[in-house]
Amino acid sequence: MSNCRTLTLLLGALLAARHAHCSPNCPPGDRALGRCMPTAEERVNIDITPEDLLPENPSTFIQFIHHSYSEMVRVLKKTAAKCSQISKTYSIGRSYEGKDLLVIEFSANPGQHEVLTPEFRYIGNMHGNEVVGRELLIYLAQFLCSEYLLGNSRIQTLINTTRIHLLPSMNPDGYEHAAEMGAGYNGWTNGRQNAQNIDLNRNFPDLTSEAHKLIRMPLARLDHMPIPESYWDGKIAPETKAVMKWMRSIPFVISGSLHGGDLVISYPYDFSRHPLEEKMLSPTPDEKVFQLLAKTYVAAHPMMSDKSTSRCGGNFNSKGGIINGAEWYSFSGGMADFSYLHTNCFELTLELGCEKFPTEDELYSIWQNNKEAMLGLIEMVHRGIKGIVKDEYGNPIKKARISVRGIRHDIITGEDGDYFRLLIPGSHIVSAEAFGYSRVTKKITLPAKMLKAGRVDFVLQRVDVRNRKFPKVIPEDIYERFDPLDRFDPHAQHGGAEPSEGDEVSSRNGEKPWWWSYFSMLGHNRPSWLLKKNENKM
């Protein structure tokens, strides 16, 4: 947006507000926001420039422009500083060319997971030439900060009850390459990949192929599937590793991956259940939940919900603006499938416009079309049920399974024993179980218009494990055995370096891995070849 247009919009806002506050006793905050008419003294000898019209704290002036990497970092850090009581920035790692993958977080207690507070994430710019998501998340960060400080009750409630993470650019290297062509260039490949020429949305472990095989086994669960060891033999982008570690470090409930090139909401599975079928409906066990999430975004987006609109050379009106990913086009190694099958998190792919790199004069209308939809999707983390699983002494039980009858996908409790289970309205049979404990089952009913998660706690009794069969549970070390992600720590600020070859291997809690004791007697002959093998797979 040009300075001239910015100035026009701001002047229009000032004129529109002239009837709102005419009292000479105008509150300072309202005066700074331009909600009050200036006094006679204030109207004398004023040379108006766009900079003069920038509202002061607490408001944030959103410039609807494209942001370079340095500009994006500056805006995010400035926003976090302005709202330091509810916001902070952190890096989850670095891109191949060394740029921080910077996240801005909003919550009542930034930097910490709070029991029974759901976690949400948005990821933008996974493909470097698809820039709409990048800009929308920069705008959203400023909007959340500004509206919170202005006393917007909806935003204050959202931030006080939710932990929100925004990663505007997963592929900053690709963006810089695409930006060289300039806004308006709508090429489909320039800058799409990262600096290693890797498509990040084809670079995640393919767990979907195995899930399609397991579906034929009646007792098999389609959740928290381990990463195949063979995956580490391939070429893995540092951006992919960083996001995978991030996914596992925080108990996200819902995620939205923002893309461009079409106007539709896609949901898992993205990989067809039949390898020879390019367009085959391949639903997850949570098909109805995914449809509910996708329809929520579409309903709040004026263009997606407009049934008279034919979009981007295609038309998804017959499907209500949503589509199963594999039914649209099939591919493996996608982030959304991995998120669903490896973690607790349900991820949507949000295709937000026909143009991948729109011009600046289109950005304001794109923001207006998506603002309400983005907020609405975040609020969906408060649907379904949540609770805490404890033993009879009140101690939380981590890694307990939360099962829903008829849905072959379980949710796992976190370190504090809390869980969040998205469900559609209606009646459900829900169970909690953990190794060494009795199983507890409850019947619940969720009203159609319930706007917050129902509280369903479980108390499990200790039982004698001898001569008793237990259902398959998540092993304590499922993420530790020979898993290179435990050798990769992207959470050090500014992308801390990976451990060097000479560093000793340890598990997440700082102890030696489970197999180390078998070799301790070997002294200097301990199996360094085994360590090197795993390190090389990084």
What residue ranges belong to the model's regions?
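A short, solvent-exposed beta-strand micro-motif common in secreted/extracellular proteins
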Residues: 426-436
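Cleavable N-terminal signal peptides of Sec/SRP-targeted secreted and luminal proteins
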Residues: 3-22
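Short glycine- and acidic-rich boundary segments immediately preceding or forming the N-terminal edge
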Residues: 22-100
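Short, acidic Ser/Thr/Gly-rich low-complexity loop/linker segments typical of extracellular
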Residues: 401-425
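Metallocarboxypeptidase
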Residues: 119, 180-393, 410, 419, ...
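Structured interaction patches on ligand/partner-binding surfaces of diverse proteins
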Residues: 437-463
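Short helix-loop-beta-strand segments that form the rim/entrance of peptidase-like active sites
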Residues: 132-180
